[in-house]
């Protein structure tokens, strides 16, 4: 996880943005964009594009990011 956020905080952030449209357990590309821009703006600077970041997060290729995919990505970042 990100060093400054606990797992509970990360789950809360995910749920806040996932609930904006459609499935409350999945982030759409637009929801992910809003989450990253608001909560982790430096990630977009480090990543060349949102498309690349979305592809990296969406491990199963279903066009949405589950909490498990989201959590795995942030755990990897904090190592």
Swiss-Prot record:
Which residues are noted in the entry as Ca(2+) 1-binding?
Answer: 26, 31
Residues reported in the UniProt entry to bind Ca(2+) 2: 58, 60, 62, 64, 69
Residues where Phosphoserine is found: 42, 47
Ranges of residues in domain EF-hand:
13-48, 45-79
- Which Gene3D superfamilies has this protein been placed in? EF-hand (1.10.238.10)
Stretch forming the signal peptide:
none
Question: What's the protein name?
Answer: Protein S100-G
Question: SMART domains in the record, alphabetically?
Answer: EFh, S_100
Calcium among keywords: yes
InterPro entries from the xrefs? EF-hand-dom_pair, EF_Hand_1_Ca_BS, EF_hand_dom, S-100_dom, S100/CaBP7/8-like_CS, S100_Ca-bd_sub
